Each structure stands twice: as C-alpha cells, then as structure tokens.
Swiss-Prot record:
GO terms for cellular component: Cul2-RING ubiquitin ligase complex; cytoplasm. This is Kelch domain-containing protein 3. Pathway: Protein modification; protein ubiquitination. InterPro entries: Kelch-typ_b-propeller, KLHDC3-like. GO terms for molecular function: chromatin binding; ubiquitin-like ligase-substrate adaptor activity. Substrate-recognition component of a Cul2-RING (CRL2) E3 ubiquitin-protein ligase complex of the DesCEND (destruction via C-end degrons) pathway, which recognizes a C-degron located at the extreme C terminus of target proteins, leading to their ubiquitination and degradation. The C-degron recognized by the DesCEND pathway is usually a motif of less than ten residues and can be present in full-length proteins, truncated proteins or proteolytically cleaved forms. Component of a CRL2(KLHDC3) complex, also named ECS(KLHDC3) complex, composed of CUL2, Elongin BC (ELOB and ELOC), RBX1 and substrate-specific adapter KLHDC3. May form oligomers as a KLHDC3-ELOB-ELOC complex; this interaction is likely autoinhibitory for the E3 ligase complex. PANTHER family: KELCH DOMAIN-CONTAINING PROTEIN 3. The keyword Repeat applies. It comes from Bos taurus. Signal peptide: none annotated. It is found in: Cytoplasm. Coiled coil: none annotated.
C-alpha cells in the first residue's frame, strides 16, 4: 500500500540538481536556485538528508590544501549527473552560465567527503547537460543530453569502466533511441530503460519544434543493442525533467513537464518490463504538487523526493514564465508499517502525545518540524 508519509519544507531550494542515496542518507549536489549569484564561479554545494532524523545539513566549503592553490572541487552547476559505485559518487557533466558545459569526471568519497579528479583514458564524451547516468556493476552508462560543442541533442551511449577508468563510445546495434535531453534512464537487471525527454522534429538539432516521446526504449548492455519493443496500450504523457526509479524489478516515473501541452505533472506511473505495460498508481496521502526538475532517491522501501520547480499558483498549472523553486521534501513509503500508520493518525487527528514513549514523540516531532536551511522564495521567469 503506497502512501505519502512525510512532507517537510525548508530544505535546499534546488532545481536540476543531482542526488544519490548512501545508506540512510541522501547526498544532493549543486543545482540551480532563482535569485542566486551564478556569475561568480564558486564550489558546488553538497547537502545531506538523514532519512532517520529527517534533517538536512550542508557540508562546509572545501579549503585549499596550500596557500594560493585552488581545491579540486567541481564548480556550481545544473543538469549534471551523479551515480554511486562502492563508496564513491561520480559526478559528470552539467553546465554553468559562466563556464558552460563540462566533461571532467569528479569523484566524491562519501567517507572522507573529499573530491578528486580521476585520470581517465579512452573516448571521453563531449561536454553536455541534460544527459542520464545509470550503473551496472562498476560501469557507468551515459546517454543523450545536449552537447555544447556540437550544439545539438545526442543519442550516443558512453560507458565508463571505473575499475580501469576507461571511457568507451558504444557502437550500438539496432534502431537507436531518438536524440534527446532531460529524459530518464533506469537500469533494471542488465537492461537500461529510457523514457521521455525533449527531442526535436528535425533530429539532433534544436529548432523549437519539440517532441515528447512517451515510448519506452530498451538498451541491452550485454549485446549492446537497442531492442525492438512491443506497443503498449496505455501510456503516460510524454514529458521531460521527470523522476524515474526502479523498485522490485519495475520502473516508476513521477512528475515532469510537457511544453507542447504547457503542462506540469504530479502523476505516478509504474511500468512492468515483463508484461510491457504501464499502470497509473494512486498512492494514499497528500503528495507533491505538479513539478519538474526535482530529485528522487530510493532509501530502503521509501522514495525521497525533493526540490524542483512549479508554476506560481496565481498563474495556474501551465505558465512557463512564472515558476516557483521548491525547498520541500516528500517521502513515499512502499510498505508503511503499523507504527508509521499510527503516527500519521496521531498527526492527522492532533491526538494527545503526552502518554507516548519519548522515542515516538521524537519521531513525531521530526515528521512535523520543517528544516531551516533554504533561501527565501523567488520567482523565476523563463
């Protein structure tokens, strides 16, 4: 029984950030926030959410190892990707309005909180943003995005073997997925499932004739081939900047935006790769408002979703030009315990807590007390 169980405000106000789950913690890297100074080049920020205490913390800036020597830290960016392999977060791609896009690989040690730039070889992908990254074993797969130098959408797949730090451009077989950015790619078994994103009627080049594909495309990492997929009778609307995650061998997507429909979404869909069918899911409880560019991480049987941007309530759900960046966080529980359901009842009906054990009162307080590290709200335009 899926249920939205937690809604807290006051976390990092972020759009187009990237995040990974490490145990019971979620690490969030960078992103954009309306009203912040992005002309001045600065270090990427790192926020950590503790899924037990339900509290956010922010890591302090990295100090130079020696006087006059700049620390090895990625610059602040958005549209980048992060993946976790062992105890290392690999951050790649993204862009900044001052420096443009980047193709330097950064490694972040979750134990020491230190950054490094591993020496890589092979065919390094061109600098881009809006790509996807997913992991199979010790290999990271990069697909799509918008390449800065070529000034076009990509449908290439690159892989990085992190045991040898070697990049490879995969010569794929079969009918490739269309060029796109801000899609999702989710690894289920040895297959990469690509959904959504923004494409263009004129192929790789951007002409403002946008296409929002709602067909699942599947890439087999063993044969390095795009598979021919059967038609699906029920489909979500095509969208970009949504969230996707795998749970119990199935694919889920949430939210996103379709410019042709001028619509933001807050629907949740489940895709079964065996029957190749979609099903719309209606969780219990109050979920997030329609949004795009949020982050979503799985922690055990829970989904932690935070940030993103939505139309201003005064403008309705479809206005592209007045957006509000979010500092909220929502938790979707796939298997809420009886204890969790009881705590929700105490909160919903404002029941007396004085007779409850101290640890239960502490948990109730954590579930209802907002964080306080977000910037003041600012509208964005465009």
């Amino acid at each position: 029984m899926l249920r939205w169980t937690v809604h807290l405000e006051g976390g990092p106000r972020r759009v187009n950030h990237a995040a990974v789950a490490v145990g019971h913690r979620v690490y969030s890297f960078g992103g954009y926030c309306s009203g912040e100074d992005y002309e001045t080049l600065r270090q990427i920020d790192v926020h950590i959410f503790n899924a037990v205490s339900l509290r956010w913390t922010k890591l302090p800036p990295v100090r130079p190892a020696a006087r006059g020597q700049a620390p090895v830290v990625p610059y602040m960016r958005y549209g980048h990707s992060t993946v976790l392999i062992d105890d290392t977060v690999f951050l790649w791609g993204g862009r900044n309005d001052t420096e443009g896009a980047c193709n330097v690989l950064y490694a972040f040690d979750v134990n020491t909180h230190k950054w490094s730039t591993p020496r890589v070889s092979g065919t390094v992908p061109g600098a881009r943003d809006g790509h996807s990254a997913c992991v199979l074993g010790k290999t990271m797969y990069i697909f799509g995005g918008y390449e800065q130098l070529a000034d076009c959408f990509s449908n290439d797949i690159h892989k990085l073997d992190t045991s040898t730090m070697t990049w490879t451009l995969i010569c794929t077989k079969g009918n490739p997925a269309r060029w796109r950015d801000f899609h999702s790619a989710t690894m289920l078994g040895s297959h990469m499932y690509v959904f959504g994103g923004r494409a263009d009627r004129f192929g790789p080049f951007h002409s403002n004739n946008e296409i929002y594909c709602n067909r699942i495309r599947v890439f087999d990492t063993r044969t390095e081939a795009w598979l021919d997929c059967p038609p699906t009778p029920v489909l979500p609307e095509g969208r970009r900047s949504h969230s996707a995650f795998g749970y119990n061998g199935e694919l889920y997507i949430f939210g996103g935006y379709n410019a042709r429909l001028n619509r933001h979404f807050h629907d949740l869909w489940k895709f079964n790769p065996v029957s190749f069918t979609w099903k719309k899911i209606e969780p219990k409880g109050k979920g997030p408002c329609p949004r795009r560019r949020q982050c979503c991480c799985i922690v055990g049987d829970k989904i932690v979703l935070f940030g993103g941007t939505s139309p201003s309530p005064e403008e309705g759900l479809g206005d592209e030009f007045d957006l509000i960046d979010h500092s909220d966080l929502h938790i979707l529980d796939f298997s809420p315990s009886l204890k969790t359901l009881c705590k929700l009842a105490v909160i919903q009906y404002n029941l007396d807590q004085s007779c409850l054990p101290h640890d239960i009162r502490w948990e109730l307080n954590a579930m209802t007390t907002n964080s306080n590290i977000s910037r003041p709200i600012v509208s964005s335009h465009g």
